[in-house]
Swiss-Prot record:
UniProt-listed NCBIfam families: PRK09585.1-1, PRK09585.1-3, PRK09585.3-2
Organism lineage string: Bacteria, Pseudomonadati, Pseudomonadota, Gammaproteobacteria, Enterobacterales
E.C. no: 2.7.1.170
Name of this protein: Anhydro-N-acetylmuramic acid kinase
Source species of the chain: Yersinia enterocolitica serotype O:8 / biotype 1B (strain NCTC 13174 / 8081)
Name of the gene encoding the protein in the UniProt record: anmK
Catalytic activities: 1,6-anhydro-N-acetyl-beta-muramate + ATP + H2O = N-acetyl-D-muramate 6-phosphate + ADP + H(+)
Top EC class for this record: transferase
Homology family: Belongs to the anhydro-N-acetylmuramic acid kinase family.
Keyword Transport: no
Pfam family, one: AnmK
GO molecular function, one term: kinase activity
SUPFAM superfamilies (UniProt xref): Actin-like ATPase domain
Sorted UniProt keywords: ATP-binding, Carbohydrate metabolism, Kinase, Nucleotide-binding, Transferase
Alphabetical list of InterPro entries matching this protein: Anhydro_N_Ac-Mur_kinase, ATPase_NBD
Length: 370
């Protein structure tokens, strides 16, 4: 496949909405043409959170959520098409990540589960859909994540400059784009996830806008050291994690050991945990000249400021400055991965995921007619 118009659909660990993006893609270029964020119904968000955090469930509940998410993703695509004034005939394919409800890369056997029925997406939109990207990498011994570093490399790598790309969603993940070295990438730990959970519990707000609440508090050093002593942070790459590990229950276990901390100080400490866990990994890799940040966390001035302070000599900037929307990066990546799949080309990087080989990712859900 030489070129086409693709739609990427992403619902990440932050659960702050369905990101949908339209892009013209060929071998040399990814040109974003439109984007849209579709709301996530509150009850559906609660259902996802319950499943992600290990609450008991049933096959019926899993099947129902899979169908509901497929319908929601299709509605999001149709809303983007209406906004852009396009029809199904204008689109080559959809790349849909799905909603991760469980990720167990070190299980015996390892597995990952993303919900959102791709059959329904293809049927409702009348557009061929590519989905289920992660499990093929796992079948070859990889962690199934992260997959976005391959896209970061295609778009943002430089021949001489040491660059790293940091996506701060619910989980923070880092792509190391170092000249003459294999691409590496992994989840550094929590991004916005714990901060969002804490402010929701204490102030009924979905996120800490402009880090206003965190800025009103102070870092609690004993709590920071306790949280950072979690074995995940010292684990070597390849590694990946998610809400099934870093969640409100994990935070409560830490807080129970050091009771009486002011809520705003907890928030400040969680922001510091995100910044510190990223900065440590950047330094361990020998540093970089530019750290390009995307995702919702790029709008957190405290996290951005702290990373700049912890990384002297590194320019901490946003991917928007380099022509790639930070809000749409992951959705763009899955549009690009759909292009790679339909072109018969690999989408994973074994140096990132630990897979035994490069492989074409995902499954294709065609439409019989439009």
């Amino acid at each position: 496949m030489k070129s086409g118009r693709f739609i990427g659909v992403m619902s990440g660990t932050s659960l702050d909405g369905i990101d949908v993006v339209l892009a013209a893609i060929d071998e040399r270029m990814v040109a974003q043409q439109a984007s849209y964020c579709h709301p996530m119904p509150l009850q559906l968000k609660k259902d996802i959170l319950g499943m992600c955090q290990g609450q008991s469930t049933t096959l019926s509940a899993v099947g129902k959520l899979d169908a509901q998410l497929g319908i929601l993703f299709a509605e999001a695509v149709l809303a983007l098409l209406a906004k852009a004034g396009l029809t199904a005939q204008d689109i080559t394919a959809i790349g849909c990540h799905g909603q991760t409800v469980w990720h167990e890369p070190l299980g015996e056997p390892a597995f990952t589960m993303q919900l959102g029925d791709n059959n329904r997406i293809a049927a409702m939109t009348k557009i061929a859909t590519v989905g289920d990207f992660r499990r093929r990498d796992m079948a070859y011994g990889g962690q199934g994540a992260p997959l976005v570093p391959a896209f970061h490399h295609a778009l943002l790598a430089h021949s001489t400059e040491r660059r790293m790309v940091l996506n701060i969603g619910g989980i923070a993940n880092l792509s190391m784009l170092l000249p003459d070295l294999p691409v590496r990438g992994f989840d550094t730990g929590p991004g916005n996830m714990l901060m969002d959970a804490w402010i929701w519990r204490n102030r009924s707000l979905p996120y800490d806008k402009d880090a206003a609440w965190a800025l009103s508090g102070q870092v609690n050093q004993p709590l920071l050291e306790l949280m950072y002593s979690d074995p995940y942070f010292a684990k070597p790459a390849p590694k990946s994690t998610g809400r099934e590990y870093f969640n409100a229950g994990w935070l409560d276990k830490q807080l129970n050991k050091i009771p009486g901390i002011k809520p705003e100080d907890v928030q400040a400490t969680l922001a510091e945990l995100t910044a510190l866990s990223v900065a440590e990994q950047v330094q361990l890799a020998g540093g970089c000249e530019r750290l390009l940040v995307c995702g919702g966390g790029a709008r957190n001035p405290l996290v951005m400021s702290r990373m700049s302070t912890l990384l002297p000599g590194t320019e901490v900037c946003v991917t928007d400055d380099f022509g790639v929307s930070g809000d749409d990066m992951e959705a763009l990546a899955f549009a690009w991965l759909a292009f790679r799949t339909l072109s018969g080309k690999s989408g994973n990087l074994p140096s990132v995921t630990g897979a035994s080989c490069e492989t074409i990712l995902g499954a294709v859900y065609p439409v019989s007619s439009r």
